[in-house]
Amino acid sequence: MSQREAGQVDLEAWQPRTRVGRLVKEGKIKSIDEIFRRNLPILETEIVDYLLPGLDHEVIDVSIVQKMTDAGRITRFRAVVVVGNKDGYVGLGKGKARQFRFAIEKAIRNAKLNIIPVRRGCGSWECTCGEAHSVPFTVRGKSGSVEVILKPAPKGTGLVAGDVAKVVLRLAGISDVWTFTKGETRTSYNFARATYLALRNTYRFVTPADWAEARLRL
């Protein structure tokens, strides 16, 4: 199930509740990269809607959870959603609610709050195209028992990954990658989160390009 987020939030009527939100609404922060560069917290989904309009989202898992209370058994839906612009930004979230639609809406909001930048590149020695179609180097992520390793692949390889990981990679803008997995990958959330954390680790290393960009800002 894939849809495009459009027109859900009235940004003109948005009244920011945080300092970062006010800076965005006033035009003092003009890009989401500036937020990540300054390590500022994203606590309002409208910040993401304002700076990254037109995000896609895809529901990767919906399950029913039950809880026993004094009033009896309460049944709720749990949804796991991935959001991304297919161009270097991706987020993962989950939400619970008594109604299916509200669970998805809550998961989308949480995914937007968890949005991260993804460094892309052409890291395979078999490919010298220089385009941002894969990961620039090998990265790994772990969630629960699931570990995911992403390795650069030459252009045209495609996404050699499980269905859940493919969704995360595609919405992040990765089109070619080798993946290696360990653990219980049937657990959709842990599989998706391990992939998400591996992509987050693409910015854990400082590259020569980062130093060059830092010098230009000085």
UniProtKB/Swiss-Prot annotation:
Residues covered by the S5 DRBM domain: 55-118
GO molecular function, one term: structural constituent of ribosome
Top-level taxon of the source organism: Archaea
Disulfide bond entries: none
UniProt cross-references to InterPro entries, sorted A to Z: Ribosomal_Su5_D2-typ_SF, Ribosomal_uS5, Ribosomal_uS5_arc, Ribosomal_uS5_C, Ribosomal_uS5_euk/arc, Ribosomal_uS5_N, Ribosomal_uS5_N_CS, Ribsml_uS5_D2-typ_fold_subgr
Entries under Pfam families matching the protein: Ribosomal_S5, Ribosomal_S5_C
UniProt keyword terms in alphabetical order: Ribonucleoprotein, Ribosomal protein, RNA-binding, rRNA-binding
GO BP terms, alphabetized: translation
GO cellular component, one term: cytosolic small ribosomal subunit
Family to which the UniProt record says this protein belongs: Belongs to the universal ribosomal protein uS5 family.
Quaternary structure, from the entry: Part of the 30S ribosomal subunit. Contacts protein S4.
Its job: With S4 and S12 plays an important role in translational accuracy.
Annotated domain remarks: The N-terminal domain interacts with the head of the 30S subunit; the C-terminal domain interacts with the body and contacts protein S4. The interaction surface between S4 and S5 is involved in control of translational fidelity.
Protein name from the UniProt record: Small ribosomal subunit protein uS5
